[in-house]
Amino acid sequence: MTPQLATTICGIALKNPVLAASGTFAYGVEFEKLVDLNALGGFVVKGLSREPIEGNPPPRVFESEAGMINSVGLQNIGVRAFVAEKLPALAGLRTAVFANVFGYCTEDYVEVVRVLNDHAGLAGYELNVSCPNTAHGGIYFSNDPVLLAEVVTAAKRVATRPLIVKLSPNVSAIEPLARVAEESGADALSLVNTVISLAIDARTRRPRIGAGFGGLSGPAIKPIALRFVYQAARAVRIPVIGLGGIATGEDAAEFLIAGASAVEVGTATFWDPRAPLRIAEELGKFLEREGIRKATDLVGTLKF
């Protein structure tokens, strides 16, 4: 019997639990000639801000030993250009499309969500809280429970679609922050974002990234991500979406076992744009080999 991959997140039906992550899948439409977008479990468009952002100086990407470091600087066309130029092409898709939202103050997040509310074609929002709050001395929303509660509460108040809060691994403990996000209105969590890192060129004695520090992603962070997903899933009652170094169907299975209800694939799409589809197929084969009828039967089954 063919295993069932279908699942739901916040009442949103997904064909399978494998989504393309924000930041590596552009606005989705750019991949339509390479990937059957309707076959995806879903995808998250790259982060959207109140106004266009040009991003950081080059070099922006460095390939590390087991992943990559990037500091693109959240370059994007801005939310208004997105709804005018990109969203119309997404509105007819038969898969779940999520908009990643970020800002540098609470009002930024609220305004982006308000603009998106007025347009069809989206299943929900993913709030990237791994950004510095410029009104509070650059403290990251994701690292401060008070700021996290403020931005999630404000976004939830205006959102007309489910709200997923994307948490950072650059914290000492994830459970308190996961609970704050849930108590402030999050409908689901996604984690982890990238790990703040530094790569150095020994010959020039300069960083290999133009902005200095960057975010590490890929296989190197998978064990870190699994730990955080497991801890967050045990701390909250809302669904958790896992990401961080997923490149195979068995990787995806590990995240489900840790407690994730779905997963997102990011860095792997750089060398294989069809990675989310391949991973979903491999997950199905893994379930079949293991005699598991449904992907949902794996969720939260880790044994100690």
From Swiss-Prot:
Cofactor names: FMN
InterPro entries in alphabetical order: Aldolase_TIM (IPR013785), DHO_dehydrogenase (IPR050074), DHOD_1B (IPR033888), Dihydroorotate_DH_1 (IPR024920), Dihydroorotate_DH_1_2 (IPR012135), Dihydroorotate_DH_cat (IPR005720), Dihydroorotate_DH_CS (IPR001295), Dihydroorotate_DH_I (IPR049622)
EC number, UniProt record: 1.3.98.1
Catalytic activity from the UniProt record: (S)-dihydroorotate + fumarate = orotate + succinate
Pathway: Pyrimidine metabolism; UMP biosynthesis via de novo pathway
This protein's UniProt keywords: Cytoplasm, Flavoprotein, FMN, Oxidoreductase, Pyrimidine biosynthesis
Recorded coiled-coil stretches: none
Catalytic residues, chain numbering: C131
Sequence positions that bind FMN: S22, K46, G47, N100, N128, K166, V192, G218, G244, G245, G266, T267
GO biological process: 'de novo' pyrimidine nucleobase biosynthetic process; 'de novo' UMP biosynthetic process
Gene Ontology MF terms: dihydroorotate dehydrogenase (fumarate) activity
GO cellular component, one term: cytoplasm
Stored SUPFAM superfamilies: FMN-linked oxidoreductases
Binding locations of substrate: K46, N70, S71, V72, G73, L74, N128, N193, T194
Locations listed in the record: Cytoplasm
Leader sequence segment: none
Pfam families membership: DHO_dh
Listed PROSITE patterns: DHODEHASE_2 (PS00912)
Cofactor note: Binds 1 FMN per subunit.
Similarity section: Belongs to the dihydroorotate dehydrogenase family. Type 1 subfamily.
Record function comment: Catalyzes the conversion of dihydroorotate to orotate with fumarate as the electron acceptor.
NCBIfam families per UniProt: PRK07259.1, pyrD_sub1_fam
Subunit comment: Homodimer.
Protein name stated in the entry: Putative dihydroorotate dehydrogenase A (fumarate)
Species for this entry: Solibacter usitatus (strain Ellin6076)
